[in-house]
From Swiss-Prot:
GO terms for biological process: methylation. Belongs to the CFA/CMAS family. The keyword S-adenosyl-L-methionine applies. The gene is TNMT1. This is (S)-tetrahydroprotoberberine N-methyltransferase 1. Homodimer. Its EC number is 2.1.1.-. It comes from Papaver bracteatum (Great scarlet poppy).
């Protein structure tokens, strides 16, 4: 009997209430989360190829009628402004908050972070002496990796988080890197006449909606010789917004505020080639993401008391608020494991595409 049949009927509010009170043990939480993703699969898979294609094309067409981005400011405040000391306690040495790449079973999180950065550089065809723009650069791990490995490159990170800009510039100074810049801006509002040899976007395009407008904007920062490398989480067959699939879906809205995240299909970006054209296309098995989030959760659990102490001052000394943040992050990690390990990593995964300017 599958988990859909095993989960007792309960309203979304009741489930969230129990979760935030600490009344749901991990084993039950795993079942509750898996139940939501099984419902998503039932929602997304259609009975015939024709119906599936029509469903997918309707989604693509709907994106082209939307604003360029989702609720970026909401996402920024709720997810990306955590203290750097907290992030360092949970993530690996480069504080990478996206998929890490495990070359072998015994790989550590630090090795997997570096392997992911290496993979990006290989597939984006990074070469020494290039100008590189990392859009949605996070804490700047990839920016710093490129700046250290390719010393003649000039690498710029763009983020709408002041905390991330400060962290990146501080790390660059510590490492004595003079080939690093950071831009504080919302990419959808940022205007520049500057062009770059390579544009990178790692797990950030998920916060965009109208990809036709967005890819057009990115193309203005490219020359005829430039390449754009995009890495995004995806489902292998269908796209969906990370929003409630029905009224009993407590999970989706808890993890991401409504309107903040779009999960594309593995081939969705192929429908947005008005201003760029695809050069290459890969997928990475979801187990790499599943292992990443599982290691993050274990690190949080191991450093729980210290992590809570770090969070406390920024949350007005409220232990309830601290518990809320920690519960959110643990649930995100547990959910990510269930999502990306489904069907041995062959349902939700990571797509990578390389584009040139048209």
């Amino acid at each position: 009997m599958g988990s859909i049949d095993e989960v007792k009927k309960e309203s979304a509010g009741e489930t969230l209430g129990r979760l935030l009170k600490g009344e749901i043990k991990d084993e039950e939480l795993k079942k509750l989360i898996k139940f939501q993703f099984e419902k998503r699969l039932q929602w997304g898979y259609k009975s015939s190829h024709q119906e599936q294609l029509s469903f997918n094309l309707d989604f693509i067409k709907s994106l082209k009628k939307m604003e360029m981005s989702g609720e970026i400011e909401t996402m920024n405040k709720e997810t990306y402004e955590l203290p750097s000391e907290f992030l360092e306690a949970v993530f690996g040495k480069t504080v990478k908050q996206s998929m890490c790449y495990f070359k072998h079973e015994s790989a550590t999180i630090d090795e997997a972070e570096e392997a992911a950065h290496e993979l990006y550089c290989e597939r984006a065809q990074i070469k020494d002496g290039q100008t590189v723009l990392d859009i949605g650069c996070g804490q700047g791990g990839l920016v710093l990796y490129i700046a250290r490995k390719y010393k003649k490159c000039h690498v710029t990170g763009l983020t709408n988080s002041k905390a991330q800009v400060n962290y990146l510039l501080k790390q660059a100074e510590k490492l004595g890197l003079t080939n690093v810049d950071a831009i504080l801006a919302d990419v959808t509002q940022y205007e520049s006449d500057k062009t770059y040899d390579r544009l990178l976007m790692i797990e950030a395009i998920e916060h965009m909606k109208n990809l036709q407008l967005f890819m057009k904007k990115l193309s203005t920062w490219m020359t005829e010789e430039s390449l754009l490398f995009v890495d995004h989480v995806c489902h292998k067959t269908f796209a969906h917004f990370f929003e409630a699939v029905d009224e009993d879906d407590w999970y989706s809205g808890f993890i991401f505020p409504p309107g903040c995240a779009t999960i594309l299909a593995a081939n969705s970006l192929l429908y947005f080639q008005d201003d760029v054209s695809v050069v290459d296309h890969w997928v990475v098995n979801g187990m790499h993401m599943a292992r990443s989030v599982d290691i993050w959760r274990k690190a949080l659990d191991k450093n729980m008391e210290a992590a809570k102490e770090i969070l406390l001052p920024g949350l007005g000394g409220s232990h309830e608020a601290v518990n809320g943040v920690v519960t959110h992050i643990r649930t995100f990690c547990m959910g990510g494991y269930e999502q990306f390990s489904m069907n041995d990593g062959d349902e939700w995964m990571v797509a990578q595409l390389l584009f040139k300017k048209k």
